[in-house]
Amino acid sequence: MTYRDAGVDIDAGNALVERIKPLVKRSFRPEVMGGLGGFGALFDLSGKYKEPVLVSGTDGVGTKLKLAQQLGRHDTIGIDLVGMCVNDVLVQGAEPLFFLDYFATGKLDVDTAAAVVGGIARGCELSGCALIGGETAEMPDMYPPGEYDLAGFTVGAVEKSQLLDGAQVRDGDVLIGIASSGPHSNGYSLIRKIYERAGAPAEHVLDDGTKLIDALMAPTALYVKPVLSLLKSHGEAIHAMAHITGGGLTENIIRVIPQGLGLDIDATAWTLPPVFAWLQREGAVADAEMWRTFNCGIGFVLIASLEQAATLEQALDAQSLAHWRIGQVVPAHGDERVRIG
């Protein structure tokens, strides 16, 4: 009996590595030392930072992965994986430096895995983050046929003096919300239930002319390059930032707000995108549940001083980023620190 007889095909793994090498190399930065295949991936941090603070993050894509597998859409789910990780470390002002992925399946399909890793490499390239390593695990009997799991890991760096930790947030600061590309990678257990119960055809078109399934599978927006540019040019105006993920607007922005302060969010400041309107209507989802489950069209939030908010908004306009002034920091209302209305 051989390892292949037991369900592990080493040759398929080697074929995958050869397929993805050119894709991965496109994401490399000058600091990357060596290529793929080593026991450890190397990154030279010596040249750019004086007092670097390393910021790490890890995440998956939730059950959006289940929907991607059902639809056979493997080429963009890797972008979601990168976005969930790099947008998180960006919150503290960090530039994502490198990324590693974990791909696990019962039987390795080289074409599927190459499509997934290609998306990861593309997400890294768009974020200026090097895909320097990963693990492909073929584990017979662990997963149903055709299914796989994903996890991502990133490390970023920020100068210690420029670290954003929320300490500068003040009463009266303004919340500037930057548009999301859709649900990103959160709320998909609810989304899948609504989608199944609604019985909507695959070709169902939303009010804006987008196919429903395209809106649901739109890759997570990558905020790294535009936000790092803002930090470089207008860093003094930004007191904190938030990535709107699981927990929605209700639970994410407040994570970077000091005790004693709260948030007033004006839900009329922007229009709920059609995909979220469809989900709320078809799922009979209450407003409060929408706010604490989905990003509702706001994927990233900048918290800025009132005096400099207009300048920051002009800089966002210059980058063609859709944005809205969605609220402000206020004294906390007892135990109720977040009000949306």
Swiss-Prot record:
Gene3D superfamilies, sorted: PurM-like C-terminal domain, PurM-like, N-terminal domain
Keyword set, alphabetical order: ATP-binding, Cytoplasm, Ligase, Nucleotide-binding, Purine biosynthesis
Keyword Nucleus part of the UniProt annotation: no
GO cellular component: cytosol
Superkingdom of the source species: Bacteria
Any one GO BP annotation for this protein: adenine biosynthetic process
InterPro entries: PurM-like_C_dom (IPR010918), PurM-like_C_sf (IPR036676), PurM-like_N (IPR016188), PurM-like_N_sf (IPR036921), PurM_cligase (IPR004733)
Protein name (record): Phosphoribosylformylglycinamidine cyclo-ligase
Naturally occurring in which organism (per UniProt): Xanthomonas euvesicatoria pv. vesicatoria (strain 85-10) (Xanthomonas campestris pv. vesicatoria)
